[in-house]
Amino acid sequence: MSGTILENLSGRKLSILVSILLLCQVLCFLLGGIFAPVPAGHLTILGSLCRENHARQNDTNFFLYSRGDGACKQVTSEEVDADALKLANQIVHVFQLPLPRENKILEYTRWQQNLIGVLQVEFGYDSSPELHEPAKELQLTIDMRLAYRNNDDADNDWKLYAHSVEHRYLDCDTSHIGPTETLYTCDMIPLFELGALHHSFYLLNLRFPLDSPKQMNLQFGHMHDLTLTAIHQNGGFTKVWLFLKSVLFPFVVGIMVWFWRRVHLLQRSPALLEYMLIYLGGALTFLNLPLEYLTLGLEMPYMLLLSDIRQGIFYAMLLSFWLIFAGEHMLIQDSGNKSTIRSRYWKHLSAVVVGCISLFIFDISERGVQLRNPFYSIWTTPLGAKVAMGFIFLAGVSAAIYFLFLCFMIWKVFKNIGDKRTSLPSMSQARRLHYEGLIYRFKFLMLATLLCAALTVAGFIMGQMAEGHWKWNEHIEIQLTSAFLTGVYGMWNIYIFALLILYAPSHKQWPSMHHSDETTQSNENIVASAASEEIEFSHLPSDSNPSEISSLTSFTRKVAFD
């Protein structure tokens, strides 16, 4: 009789295995909750005002900076207000990051991986009744120049990283109405995104050119305060994350080699579920591969895009596996033909493929372009923002629908098992106990699958959040978000690790004569038990589907002969 380790492993050994895996799961949660900081940190920087040097206005290799030798002389708000034209086309807004702390110069490290900048704009206009409610979707033209230097460079040795003239659309509300001027505060707008944080210091120069013939920036009056929020991945979290990947990677590779070797020792071709398990293990191995170590020595601005692709491949493989995993255990065989993806699951998997391709197109349309222009964002235009929100909304709805459909499939599996259990009393006692044990173990595994799917959906939704923390975890020692992320990541590895063990072919199917010289007394008992069970089933006709790996899937045929 065909069998897997799940079916033939003793209850004591199975309990020990499950206990070890649960302990590893707890350790993954504790690793993120106790040792890792929140995944992301941020700096809030109020822009400094510097007067433009008209002789070098178009020189993209000239930068104004606010700290260090040769820093610009900053312009005060009183000087701006005193000028009739508010120093139009003479002001440069300067952001130098990171900020010093306690008179100590801080610098970015490559462990922080990436940097995202968002900008909040406040502008003023002469008070007038018709201007109290500004028009929606105001277009702002910004000349952006981003520079960098390293800790061994001179204070004035800034090098151009990127330059672009971009348009941003503002949604503003009145914040203060004065006797001579009305102030408006606008929603945050995306400014730039760096896929690699390779340098120590960064400098941002923003200009807001005024041009009457082109009607450029004329509807804003003059700028007041500009606030830049720079969001970076915490280096401490990156170290914990890479430690987790480095530990899990060799274990998954080792169990895949062990699993595939056992499959090939059988005198049959691998079953569909065995192929799916090895594909799933391969996708997880690709995700576990700690490529982020390369960013410590190389500048890899495409690492964010590569990480999204790796995670997308894993999600696609995991979602596909769950559908096939549940479908293969429906206990309904329409024909004796071997199950294939094309014949039985193409409708289910086509939805997963379409969804993953849609998300890939959305991702490549933004982060792919950002490799050339870090100031580009699909969120900058009203239409682009609506399309992006639509993609995220559809992704969330699709994830919820998928989870409900998976719950329905698992419910059908449980229902079919319940229907077939009515045939157990007519069986012999040995076989009845055998199948009751299989059903109990299988139900436990399916519930674990459902829990893994639920946490995966929750993790996917959390991954779409702009901020990497929850408001209620700011004053407690355990970082809930970090614990959740490392816990879910560890859960994927532990779950797939367990499947590769439990669905590997069992040793009890192998002829005992090949190992007679090494067999102990306990093993002889196992072989004798297996032999007696084989005699009990010997009157059954040969299985028409020799590729089945679980006796549960052949339960319906064998019941008829008891």
Curated annotation (Swiss-Prot):
Record key words, sorted: Cell membrane, Cell projection, Developmental protein, Endoplasmic reticulum, Endosome, Glycoprotein, Golgi apparatus, Membrane, Postsynaptic cell membrane, Segmentation polarity protein, Synapse, Transmembrane, Transmembrane helix, Wnt signaling pathway
PANTHER family named in the record: INTEGRAL MEMBRANE PROTEIN GPR177 (PTHR13449), PROTEIN WNTLESS HOMOLOG (PTHR13449:SF2)
Positions on the Cytoplasmic side per record topology: 1-15, 261-270, 333-344, 412-441, 504-562
InterPro entries per record: WLS-like_TM (IPR047843), WLS_GOLD (IPR053936), Wntless (IPR009551)
Transmembrane annotation, as ranges: 16-36, 240-260, 271-291, 312-332, 345-365, 391-411, 442-462, 483-503
Subunit structure: Interacts with wg; in the Golgi. Interacts with Vps35, a component of the retromer complex; wls stability is regulated by Vps35.
Primary residence: membrane
Region of interest: Disordered: 539-562
Family as reported in the entry's similarity comment: Belongs to the wntless family.
Topology within the bilayer: Multi-pass membrane protein
Record's function text: A segment polarity gene required for wingless (wg)-dependent patterning processes, acting in both wg-sending cells and wg-target cells. In non-neuronal cells wls directs wg secretion. The wls traffic loop encompasses the Golgi, the cell surface, an endocytic compartment and a retrograde route leading back to the Golgi, and involves clathrin-mediated endocytosis and the retromer complex (a conserved protein complex consisting of Vps35 and Vps26). In neuronal cells (the larval motorneuron NMJ), the wg signal moves across the synapse via the release of wls-containing exosome-like vesicles.
Segments on the Lumenal face: 37-239, 292-311, 366-390, 463-482
One GO MF term: Wnt-protein binding
Name of the molecule in the record: Protein wntless
Glycan-bearing residues: 58
Compartments in which it is found: Presynaptic cell membrane; Postsynaptic cell membrane; Cell membrane; Endoplasmic reticulum membrane
Polar residues composition bias: residue spans: 541-556
Cellular component per GO, a single term: neuromuscular junction
Top-level taxon in the UniProt lineage: Eukaryota
GO biological process, one term: positive regulation of protein secretion
